[in-house]
Amino acid sequence: MAYELPQLPYAYDALEPHIDAKTXEIHHSKHHNTYVTNLNAAVEGTEFADKDINDLIAMLDALPADKQTAVRNNGGGHANHTLFWEVIAPGGSNTPVGEVAKAIDAKFGSFDAFKEEFAKAATTRFGSGWAWLIVDGDSVAVTSTPNQDSPVMEGKTPVLGLDVWEHAYY
């Protein structure tokens, strides 16, 4: 089984005016696709080629040393972007509901306080990377990771990811 570029559940222009159609197309069909292509090349013919992407990046230390960097960068890029495309839905809600809302309120006191913390994680990430809302034990937390690292690599569950690479917003 080769890893595949997921189809977007919306058109490239569906995120306008926040992300223009050309940026969404390049980001998905070029950048994300490159991560998938390079990941497949790295794991082709190995026992790792059939792993779920999140299972694969969670076991980086168990991979052969010569595969770890390629899987970290490209597997992380594929996993991160797959979540990214799922959570930035056009016409989505501006505020969380249900269990996510309760967890945010319990941890941060309010959605506005969460937004401040999340924005801080995104704007203070030196260089390229991601800002995250993660499940950490019985609570949620805000964190950031460099490059294409994923919270999954640290045993955490990402709920929301914001790509802060320069290529995300030409």
Swiss-Prot record:
Kindly state which keywords UniProt assigns to this record, in alphabetical order.
Iron, Metal-binding, Oxidoreductase
Q: Gene3D superfamilies attached here? A: Fe,Mn superoxide dismutase (SOD) domain (1.10.287.990), Iron/manganese superoxide dismutase, C-terminal domain (3.55.40.20)
What is this enzyme's class at the first EC digit?
Answer: oxidoreductase
EC number from the UniProt entry: 1.15.1.1
Tell me, what's a Pfam family for it? Sod_Fe_N
Chain sites annotated for binding Fe cation:
27, 81, 163, 167
Listed GO MF terms: metal ion binding; superoxide dismutase activity
Q: What does it catalyze?
A: 2 superoxide + 2 H(+) = H2O2 + O2
Q: What does this protein do?
A: Destroys superoxide anion radicals which are normally produced within the cells and which are toxic to biological systems.
Subunit composition and interactions? Homodimer.
What family is this protein classified in? Answer: Belongs to the iron/manganese superoxide dismutase family.
The protein's matches in PANTHER family, at most eight in alphabetical order, are given as: 37S RIBOSOMAL PROTEIN S26, MITOCHONDRIAL, SMALL RIBOSOMAL SUBUNIT PROTEIN MS42
Protein's name according to its UniProt entry? Superoxide dismutase [Fe]
